[in-house]
Amino acid sequence: MKIEEPLEDLDVNNLQQSSQQVPFEHIIETMLDENIPLPTLYLYRLSDISDKDLENLQQYWLKIPLWRRRALMEDLQMFAKRDLLLSYEGIGRLALKDPDPKVRIGAIETLMANECECLDLIDIYLERMEKDEDLSVRIAAASALGQFVYLAEMEALKPEIKTNLEDRLLNVAQNGNDSELRRRALESLGYSSRDEVPNLIELAFNTPDPNFQTSSLIAMGRSGNERWNAQVVSMLNHSNPSIRSEAARAAGELGIVEARNLLFDLAEDANQNVCMSALWALSQIGGKGVRKLLQERLQEAEDEDEISLLESALDNLDFNEGTHDMALMGDEEEESDELFEDSLDEDLEEDIYDFDEDEDDFLDDLDDEDFDDFLDDEDEDYDFLDDEDEEDLWG
């Protein structure tokens, strides 16, 4: 298309407010005329589109030049990633039905960038994964299903929906006719606790294909299962930078403390992706020297994406260390409560024991005649209770 102004020079709040003043018919006219650039303002107008405007756009959608439809979805995906307040769900759903596969892929990726979790998308993505005529669309749909596997694992989906979703992903991961399609299905299944998944991850990890090894590391990180710690650490020094990068990412997601020293080394890796993955992983694990390293790298950074990642990493470190501190405080309070309860139990036991001992000593000092008098006195006490009028006794 592409957008006319650099994003960093834009006042987002003003754009969002100003965009609502633009007649939607004018936006459609501009889209239809390939000689007119589409202003950034119009992209904000497409956020949270009304049903009426969406219906209007649908009538003209296929008349918009193909190159512009493709470019539009790329731009909307970028905007959705940069501003979480923007929602392009309406136009994303419209583009899912586009006859062009690149537009359909753009639609899926835009909905993913918006973190759209509407449950009806599960069946739509499953249908695309299994039956779309274009392989790239099937691959994109398999990747998009990962967020719903995660929701299923968090018990946010009905059991029957969860089972259907996992069954169909497992079928593709095991029997798909394309290796990348199988890999993306495996990556999405990484969130699942199904019994079949660990074996699939193990098979992918042990294959000589570096692409399958990379996918296995993605699935390991998503599993949250420490059973994979040793395999992940073993790949941190791999000669393939893609594998090193995903191993670093998985180490962070699994919180592998033993990987910290290797991650510090990878933070100096010649490959930028490896370096950034290592820095992010360190922000997840935390510990001595991490904050200093992130702050130093932020001061040195010039690239916008690197600056953004480092700022996010520092925020992430703050969050993780805060959560850790709260957990420690909770453990200390629990331990203190347990110590108090143990001490209280011991005191009560001692008091009971002392009372029993005193009573035994008292009884031992009584001769038989005194003991009989003691019992008679107790009987008189109970007789007193029997003789008292209940109303007088309790008022």
Labelled PLM ranges:
Residues 1-34, 41-45, 80-82, 284, ...:
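DE-rich, low-complexity intrinsically disordered acidic tracts
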Residues 9, 13, 18-26, 49-61, ...:
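Amphipathic alpha-helical scaffolding segments comprising HEAT/armadillo-like alpha-solenoid repeats
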Residues 30-71, 75-91:
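Alpha-helical solenoid scaffolds in large eukaryotic transport, assembly, and signaling factors
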Residues 36, 66-70, 101-102, 133-136, ...:
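Alpha-helix N-cap/helix-start positions at coil->helix boundaries
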Residues 40, 70-74, 105-106, 139-143, ...:
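Alpha-solenoid HEAT/ARM repeat scaffold
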Residues 74, 109, 143-147, 187, ...:
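Residue-level signature of alpha-solenoid helical repeat scaffolds
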Residues 77, 112, 146-150, 190, ...:
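Structural signature of alpha-helical solenoid repeat scaffolds
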Residues 210, 214-222, 226-249, 253, ...:
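Alpha-helical adaptor scaffolds
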